Amino acid sequence: MASRWWVVPAGRLRRLVYPQADRMRAEIAELRKANAKLNTRVAELSADLDAVKAEFEKLHTWRTQLHADMDAADRDRIELVRPYTMTSMDKLTSLTLAVRYIVQSGIDGDFMECGVWKGGSVHLMARVLGDAGVTDRDIYLFDTFAGMTEPTARDVDSAGVSAKERMQKSSKKAKIWAISPREEVEAGLQTLDYPQQRFRLVEGRVEDTIPGQAPERIALLRLDTDWYESTRHELEHLWQRVTPGGVVIIDDYGSFKGSREATDEFFQRLDPPPFLQRAGNARVVVKR
């Protein structure tokens, strides 16, 4: 019997041989999308885990640095301010002792910080004052509440990297920008028992707000604006207002060259220059 052959169009043959090919390809594409999403989620969870590990290590470091000569109240206060500060344990300990010294010595004047971020150091001041039964001191918070001002070429970190370069390469969410809106700072202050009317927030560049809006007499002055120009301006206008026996803290002395140069230039003009006590990489001065 003779063989019979049929000519079938290629498209029809494909449909005959693989009737479900299109559906299978669609399912494979969906599986690939799902797999990509899964990989993304795994990466996110891995990053979250790394963040948790980093926070745990930070907490462990904080706890191991809680000095044996600190009492339980000191430890509790420092733990409470942790969410509001980037300040090290040594600096917070020094600040605690400075506030206590001012109270015990009866040093007259208000408390003032330039560059507050979320207000953690002010929280600590208020808590130490309140626990000592002192609620009549005004506490001034000077900040742009919009992040750091523009650094200059003199502002270089301890690794030799310019602050401007670091900021340009960093997201504005990075800590070097130190952005904390006024509303966020005010909300933090409202968690404290210290009289709210005693907190005086001054918004703007310190070059614009000081000396005009600064208190006349200062018992404790904490400078944390990082850069040469701001630190120089603060010292030149505020040192004369610090009460004899009062305390000045320069937070970024060891972190940024500009802050250190401004501090050294100013104090070396005094006769005699004061002793700068080290607290972490900050410097603490008691005015004679």
Q: How would you describe each model-predicted region?
A:
Residues 1-74, 86:
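Boundary detector for helix-to-coil junctions that initiate low-complexity/charged tails
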Residues 68-89, 105-288:
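S-adenosylmethionine/decaboxylated-SAM
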Residues 94-106:
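Conserved alpha-helix/loop element of class I SAM-dependent methyltransferases that forms part
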